[in-house]
């Protein structure tokens, strides 16, 4: 009984630590170091690579660092809503509920780098926003870090539209 209570307390302490502790981005390969350098030095960066090479993870890590340091006001995350089954309109729920499954991987990356509590705070303050690419036309995002995930599924017109949404002091 004592061991079970102690194990429960230890698990609770680990969860509390995870909730508030941001993680630091570390490049594991030379290509990742080059990608990070490119993001820091340029306003617009396109990255290609095989699945699991860290493209989205690194973009989220740098965005989180910039938000934590107050170097940006907002992180904007989008991706094309490519369906393999029913189209988006036929899915149940409000727009946010419909796009959530598509943006879940990036949400998990940002939670990892910010910690659960900070992620929740920034999300509630709308400093982290998940926007459908299809509804961005006409918007301008100033002082923002913009991530277009899974861009290989975009048309050239969608990529051009996304890049032209960048306002002052955005990357």
Go through the PLM ranges and name each one.
Residues 126-161:
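Conserved RecA-like ASCE ATPase "motif II neighborhood" in helicase/translocase motors
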Residues 1-15:
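Interdomain "pre-motor" coupling segment immediately N-terminal to P-loop NTPase/helicase cores
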Residues 48-50, 57-125:
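Conserved P-loop
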Residues 53, 80-85, 135-137, 152-153, ...:
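Conserved nucleotide-binding/hydrolysis micro-motifs of P-loop NTPases
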Residues 81, 85-92, 158-171:
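Conserved P-loop NTPase nucleotide-binding/switch module
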Residues 71-73, 143, 167-171:
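Short glycine-/polar-rich loops that comprise or flank the Walker A/P-loop
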Residues 41-47, 143:
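Pre-Walker A (Motif I) flank of P-loop NTPase domains
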Residues 24-42:
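Pre-Walker A adenine-sensing motif
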């Amino acid at each position: 009984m004592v061991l079970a209570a102690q194990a429960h307390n230890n698990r609770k302490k680990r969860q509390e630590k995870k909730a508030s502790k941001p993680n630091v981005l570390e490049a594991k390969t030379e290509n990742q170091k080059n990608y990070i350098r490119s993001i820091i030095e340029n306003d617009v960066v396109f990255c290609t690579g095989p699945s699991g090479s860290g493209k989205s993870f690194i973009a989220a890590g740098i965005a989180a660092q910039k938000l934590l340091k107050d170097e940006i006001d907002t992180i904007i995350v989008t991706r094309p809503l490519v369906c393999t089954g029913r189209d988006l309109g036929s899915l149940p729920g409000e727009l946010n509920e419909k796009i959530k499954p598509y943006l879940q991987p990036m949400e998990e990356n940002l939670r990892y780098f910010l910690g659960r509590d900070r992620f929740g705070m920034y999300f509630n303050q709308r400093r982290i926003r998940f926007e459908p690419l299809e509804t961005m036309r006409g918007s301008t995002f100033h002082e923002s870090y913009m991530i277009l995930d899974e861009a290989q599924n975009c048309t050239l017109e969608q990529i051009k539209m996304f890049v032209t949404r960048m306002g002052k002091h955005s990357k």
